[in-house]
């Protein structure tokens, strides 16, 4: 420790060294200012065209970086009236070099990204600026578009409401704003298209991720899923929900609070064990037998619970218990309009259309006694971890990344560089105060809020759930404190509430959704007030939005004058007072809450009020602390404040962060297996769509198949001295309608086997060539492509299910002293190679056996999988590693009957062709 401190004193911190290395580039940018100032607007566009031409000719972007950055800075000054500070230019240099910038709230991250985005757009390969929601994507694109227009680069924005053509145009722009969800779903949908021209995205070159910690860490365990309807087993969830109350939790040791160890032979009383930290439930031996008795008595099963047809009920009981014990209404989800809507644990926002995966959502619907929706089947999936690792260069910005620097470096190979604030941070972060009980804590918080409100200091209170925010709201109402509540239930008023959160005397209770991407200004927000005034004036006279803009300037001048006085008064009162009502699992989330106060050198204050009943304290040693504090004579209502307590809490948070990192890393190791397979299958699919000689793939497959079979026959001949052609003949007949004839094989040798292979291959090639003559090369190529794509899509869905089953069961291999991950990799790739062989051989078989009719036929477009990829309904849930974000394709067109002719044109019944 002393050595590290000494080295830091001598050489500076890593962040200081990183910034020092960039100073020559910053000086070079500043030196270009005299060159750029006299330029006319048209010359900016000329320079952009010149730089694009140089980049297209192979020149590195760094060759004209100083000039490009100087152009971007001057364009921002002329268009927005804001000249990026040197620290913002430093931040843009960090982004350009593929690193993460940590920049405090209110320091201008949106403007900082302009120079890096402009420079990299000159490559002609597209830059993606990624935000967490549509509102921020649209706002930032609208705000920065005039700057980019001045420079002569095009800007697009991807919104969830857009169709395919709009998306295609937006992705073709030099710079594209969009959300992480939309970019990920577009990637999956593109790989479900039948025609290359229907794809929307280009290759992944450079991305700048806003709030990068939220996307790459908080949502890292969130798989994006496009899904379709699966087996309808909704009645089982309702049946089990009625029975689950008959089960009892295993009794704990009253002295330690621990469960008995069944493996060591300790007596177990009860049916299930709850793992609150990991949100899991497991059953005891007696519990399994009790479930069997309950199901038998209810008439739902016959025989043993462990029979193949009954084993599924263990899954239904597991999810029912998780729904009742580990997922709470108004904390993890809300019930609205007859639907269970997920609440993001990190932002407090409702995650529109998302659903918990693996049947958990259905179990919660059964618990809440609302309509249970049918489960879905995964059709395409990718995690954010693997999606963003596809970019050639990745960077990002946030106010809180340094605490997660290790994870960001290990998983994404991204370094974090902390930028100094333009003005020193004047916020005072006080020690936590801890109370024995939750009720004592709430009482103290209310007293603190009322005191600050009385003197006029604005207060922002952060809560971890809707339930807690509404509880505090009720307590404040009884004390007569006027306040606003911002949570997922009233998120529509977010802009209004946040705009006034810094006004004199305001009290705002908010879940974590408060203000990521927005600033809380002391004294209120003059722009927002001016727009409200201008809108009111215009509507009073029945005027249009054009008239609103005409009134804006006058209204803004009046509001700005009032705001300056309010701002100075609130500064004198100490600025925004941030109160935390509970520590989060991650220090980073706590820092985000603190960061709402003290923007751009403003004064501020932050303080956390805790109790030993809080989740973090209770799970990580709260009972022991409570006994200790009682022994030292703490009186009810008396708080404890000490630096060692803060360190103890931070140690608990560090443990949780390390555990969550291990979980994400472990999941990534498993997902990397799927990612490698997905990359290969998508690449093959894309190549098939553009392959002008697709029939050669069929010829290769047939030849490889014959080589394998003939090799096996040669080995048999060597081993036995004679041949048995029965199985080979049966396979040829089944696959290719080919008969060997009646030749006696008793005298065959290896030479005859070689000529046999050539005879069969020549016959099958002639068969296919005759179809090309009859149907035409274009029609046959289209038919083969269609068969390939359909087979890939169908087999890939089956393969995803097999991998999921393997992943859920492979952990049992550890009991046999085997590494589950190694076993998963080995068996996963065995399944994958088997799938590839099945696809290739099934296509070769179909092409050989298809009948070509001498009439005009149009090969149809693929069925609903590809067509519906344009339209989807979002489903699925992120968070805690148990959810997924999904999109559900909508089936379009009439369903093909199993006994009707197959639409592919083979002449066979659908059930004997593509419907197999």
Swiss-Prot record:
Membrane topology according to the record: Peripheral membrane protein
EC supergroup of this enzyme: translocase
EC number: 7.4.2.8
CDD domains linked: DEXDc_SecA, SF2_C_secA
Cofactor names: Zn(2+)
Gene Ontology molecular functions: ATP binding; metal ion binding; protein-exporting ATPase activity
Ligand binding (Zn(2+)): 902, 904, 913-914
Superkingdom of the organism of origin: Bacteria
Gene3D superfamilies tied to this protein: Helical scaffold and wing domains of SecA (1.10.3060.10), P-loop containing nucleotide triphosphate hydrolases (3.40.50.300), SecA, preprotein cross-linking domain (3.90.1440.10)
Cell location: Cell inner membrane; Cytoplasm
Residues holding ATP: 88, 106-110, 519
Bound cofactor: record note: May bind 1 zinc ion per subunit.
GO terms for biological process, alphabetical: intracellular protein transmembrane transport; protein import; protein targeting; protein transport by the Sec complex
Keyword Cell membrane in annotation: yes
GO annotation, cellular component aspect: cell envelope Sec protein transport complex; cytosol; plasma membrane
Keyword entries, A-Z: ATP-binding, Cell inner membrane, Cell membrane, Cytoplasm, Membrane, Metal-binding, Nucleotide-binding, Protein transport, Translocase, Translocation, Transport, Zinc
Catalytic activities: ATP + H2O + cellular proteinSide 1 = ADP + phosphate + cellular proteinSide 2
InterPro entries: Helicase_ATP-bd, P-loop_NTPase, SEC_C_motif, SecA, SecA_CS, SecA_DEAD, SecA_motor_DEAD, SecA_preprotein_X-link_dom
Function: Part of the Sec protein translocase complex. Interacts with the SecYEG preprotein conducting channel. Has a central role in coupling the hydrolysis of ATP to the transfer of proteins into and across the cell membrane, serving as an ATP-driven molecular motor driving the stepwise translocation of polypeptide chains across the membrane.
Subunit-level organization: Monomer and homodimer. Part of the essential Sec protein translocation apparatus which comprises SecA, SecYEG and auxiliary proteins SecDF. Other proteins may also be involved.
Protein name: Protein translocase subunit SecA
Gene behind this protein: secA
